[in-house]
Amino acid sequence: MVPAHGGRAAEPVYRPILASRRGELEALGHLDDVVTSLLAPVLQVSILDSYTLDVLGRLPTGLLPAVDVTGLPDAPETELARWGVPLVPVIGLADSDRRLVAHGAAARGHAHRAVVRLRVGQDRAGPDATTAAVERVWRLARLVPEQCDLLLDAGDVCCAADVRLAEPRLRRLLEWARRHAWRSVSVAAGGMPPAVSGLPTDEPVRLDRWDWRLWQRLADLGVGYGDYGVGSAVPGADQPGDRLPTVRYTTDDAWWVYRWSRRGGRGDDRFADLCRALVSAPHWPAAGADFSWGDHEIVRRARRGAGAGSASNWAAWSTSHHLAHVLATLARPGREARPEPWRSGQPAAERGRPARPHRGGETRRAG
């Protein structure tokens, strides 16, 4: 993977929200140690099995994932402190008292911190009610704000209208967030459509990265960046559909989706054809196979050095390139959207005009 930083350890600059599927976990397992300190993945665990626990225990040195078990039953076996692997708990405002206590134990058992995930479309109380909700979290988990990274999750953002709707909500939440001494604050969204099976085949299709555009409009406020990798933020999306070889390839402001049915024969032939088209495209990186583990695997298939693989492999290679691209972009010298560090206690200005205190307490929503 292309190094995304000059070498010294640093706070994470990127919080991808990833499903705990084989493809995404394999991509994390192939990260270079030089970039692990810059990445703080949030893993959404919907099925607890031995494979997931085994992979979590074998992640690269320095990579400490945050784990969200909202999709699992509230039961003793889903208590993160029992898993026996280093991790950071992800806390939701609606978590039960029992789960908050368990998350606090998990936080104290490893990194002494947690991620508080506020879902913009669901947790839409006023600022005072939101403060009461996070104070409940801190009390039951026995944590303080300085131990908590706030993740504002805008969910599905797939068009310009979604960006226009999400931005003012996020700005109000960021204004509220400055009341508290958070360890950090990040904004995440997902711009990938729920399904790509309806896209044209045998040609790369460009899809705008609306999640990235949304964050660029907020980066001046000092917030960190998060997304859903190359997956969708829509619950239940990305389910197995057609079996056509598919690669979702990230560039600065777009994805190029390759779905290949050409040649009509063996899957190895179709995928080799897809990979040859990709490595000859203008958006193929100058570093080529050295850009990421995923790019290396794509080059191998273009040269017919290995078989086509499976849908999990295609997701792994796509995710690997995506993580490398985002990290390289965030660390790029002179990048316009480079954020200043988050500071609490400072008013968040409305875009294009100075900030001023609002009146009316609960009459103005926090999200």
What is the meaning of each model-derived region?
Residues 1-95, 183-184, 194-367:
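Alpha/beta catalytic barrel-like cores
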Residues 74-237:
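Eukaryote-skewed repeat-based solenoidal scaffolds used as protein-protein interaction platforms
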